[in-house]
From Swiss-Prot:
It catalyses: a (3R)-hydroxyacyl-[ACP] = a (2E)-enoyl-[ACP] + H2O. It comes from Wolbachia sp. subsp. Drosophila simulans (strain wRi). Involved in unsaturated fatty acids biosynthesis. Catalyzes the dehydration of short chain beta-hydroxyacyl-ACPs and long chain saturated and unsaturated beta-hydroxyacyl-ACPs. Pfam families: FabA. GO terms for molecular function: (3R)-hydroxyacyl-[acyl-carrier-protein] dehydratase activity. Belongs to the thioester dehydratase family. FabZ subfamily. Keywords: Cytoplasm, Lipid A biosynthesis, Lipid biosynthesis, Lipid metabolism, Lyase. Its EC number is 4.2.1.59. Coiled coil: none annotated. GO terms for cellular component: cytoplasm; membrane. This is 3-hydroxyacyl-[acyl-carrier-protein] dehydratase FabZ. It is found in: Cytoplasm.
């Protein structure tokens, strides 16, 4: 399954400037997802992070992975009156900086689902090089 930005804005509650997934290139709902965040110099966070040496903040890379994970849980058929909330982030590692012009590939695979908590193994990469990784847990709840 693939989703364009029109699909994504129907699935996620986020909006500019905090919508951090541009396209889904592969999704097996409830199992795995591969998505894209195009990183441009026009991102508002580059104003202060860092002047003259722009780097995407690590927390926003993690947020991008969390948003991709939420799409994986919800799928294209958004569950009415439900939302996915971030529950925990474990073992986050940042390996290389992400800079303007990069295409950030976001991958999340569900490791387990227990009592409504979805646990994902997530990897962010640029040009097939791992730039960040984390284990993210999220819960599907009523709005």
């Amino acid at each position: 399954m693939q989703f364009n930005i029109s699909d994504i804005i129907k699935i996620l509650p986020h909006s500019y400037p905090f919508l951090l997934v541009d396209r889904v290139i592969e999704c097996d709902p409830g199992k795995s997802i591969k998505a894209i965040k195009n990183v441009t110099f026009n991102e508002p966070f580059f104003i202060g992070h860092f002047p003259g040496h722009p780097i995407m903040p690590g927390v926003l890379i993690i947020e991008s992975l969390a948003q991709a994970s939420a799409i994986c849980v919800l799928g294209k058929e958004t569950i009415e009156n439900k939302v996915v909330y971030l529950r925990s982030i474990e073992n986050a590692k940042f390996r290389k900086p992400v800079t303007p012009g990069d295409t950030l590939i976001l991958q999340a695979n569900i490791q387990s689902v227990c009592l409504g908590v979805h646990k994902f193994r997530c990897i962010a990469s640029v040009s097939e090089e791992k730039v960040a990784e984390a284990t993210i847990s999220a819960v599907l709840q009523n709005k």
